[in-house]
């Protein structure tokens, strides 16, 4: 029995789910906003906030953890440079989820997740 799931399973095996979240996190940090389904946006929020918290910490160990998760090494360096000045006074809540219209093909609930 799996009690208290921390992230939704998103109807994918573990390796595909991790790759999906890594890709979405990389895209969110690069672009600043991502349009995806509501369930994926909620799962992405945890990962993105974890990466920004690592960037605020700024230690070598946290930088290495971020490089191991985010696909683009240059993106990690730019995140670590900008995170303290952008989110220095904020203790969490670095992202915002805004619901949008449902997807036309399958009527899935869509959302825009963006960095605050």
Curated annotation (Swiss-Prot):
GO molecular function (one): structural constituent of ribosome
PANTHER family: LARGE RIBOSOMAL SUBUNIT PROTEIN BL17M, RIBOSOMAL PROTEIN L17
Gene Ontology biological process terms, A to Z: translation
UniProt cross-references to InterPro entries, sorted A to Z: Ribosomal_bL17 (IPR000456), Ribosomal_bL17_sf (IPR036373)
GO cellular component entries: cytosolic large ribosomal subunit
Designated name of the protein: Large ribosomal subunit protein bL17
Subunit and interaction comment: Part of the 50S ribosomal subunit. Contacts protein L32.
Organism, scientific name: Prochlorococcus marinus (strain AS9601)
Domain of life of the native organism: Bacteria
Keyword Ribonucleoprotein belongs to the record: yes
Family statement drawn from the similarity comment of this UniProt entry: Belongs to the bacterial ribosomal protein bL17 family.
Ribosomal protein found in the keyword field: yes
Keyword tags: Ribonucleoprotein, Ribosomal protein
